[in-house]
A protein has these predicted regions:
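Hydrophobic/aromatic beta-strand patches that form the interior of the parallel beta-sheet core
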Residues: 41, 66-68, 144, 177-178
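A short helix-turn-beta junction within AAA+ P-loop NTPase domains corresponding to the substrate/partner-engaging
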Residues: 63-65, 158-181
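A short beta-strand-to-loop transition that corresponds to the Sensor-1 phosphate-sensing loop
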Residues: 145-151, 155-159
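Conserved catalytic segments around the Walker B and adjacent sensor/switch elements
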Residues: 62-72
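Mid-core helix/loop region of P-loop NTP-binding domains shared across ATPases and GTPases
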Residues: 75-82, 89-144, 164-165, 169, ...
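Walker A/P-loop nucleotide-binding motif
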Residues: 36-57, 71-72
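A short, basic N-terminal segment
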Residues: 1-38
Length: 192
């Protein structure tokens, strides 16, 4: 439809109020640090704690930061074209041209940050392409991957099975998973 192509909403969106919770503060601090230093990280935590809201809010208020819902762009082609489109790079045409234009653009702007939410939904080829994109933009672009505990399990299982690319990808994202909520059940309940 024309409204979809132009990005026009046909209904009023509910306005959300920002509650600066411990989750909001933690993720915002991580995103700011990542963007300012062009470092990458992975956040894996339980659902419904405000990860997505915080990431979207951050992108609205910070230059050169984009939010990608990976559950909507699971394939390599869709993912790269979506990232390009979010930065205003031409996402149509030959894939190789889109890829080259995107990596060139990311290396030429100041402190780009790409937030990959629901990253556990990405297909294997898309994960490999993230590694390639990271390599092509090293020290000039920050990448922040987010997901629930399933993302951590997917990466760990793939590393244990010696699936090509996962060990390298984890190392590029800091070799660890960050988490907001406490592991202990009683502490987590008090936190939430």
């Amino acid at each position: 439809s024309i409204s979809r192509r132009l990005g026009v909403s046909l209904r009023a969106d509910m306005e959300w109020k920002v509650a600066k919770t411990a989750t909001f503060e933690y993720i915002t601090a991580q995103l700011e640090f990542s963007q300012q230093s062009s470092l990458s990280a992975i956040l894996c935590d339980i659902p419904n704690i405000g990860k997505t809201f915080t990431a979207r809010y951050y992108v609205q208020n910070h230059k050169n930061a984009v939010y990608i819902d990976c559950s909507q762009v699971k394939t390599k082609l869709k993912l790269v074209r979506k990232i390009a489109a979010e930065f205003g790079v031409d996402a149509k045409g030959k894939y190789s041209d889109v890829y080259e234009d995107l990596t060139y653009y990311l290396r030429s702007i100041e402190n780009p940050l790409i937030i990959l939410d629901e990253a556990g939904d990405l297909q294997y080829e898309a994960f490999l392409e993230l590694k390639a994109l990271w390599n092509a933009t090293e020290r000039s672009c920050a990448w922040y991957m987010m997901g629930a505990d399933g993302l951590k399990e997917k990466i760990n299982r793939s590393i244990e099975c010696k699936k090509v690319g996962y060990t390298e990808m984890l190392s590029r994202y800091g070799d660890r998973y960050s988490k907001v909520t406490p592991d202990d059940g009683k502490e987590r309940e008090a936190f939430l």
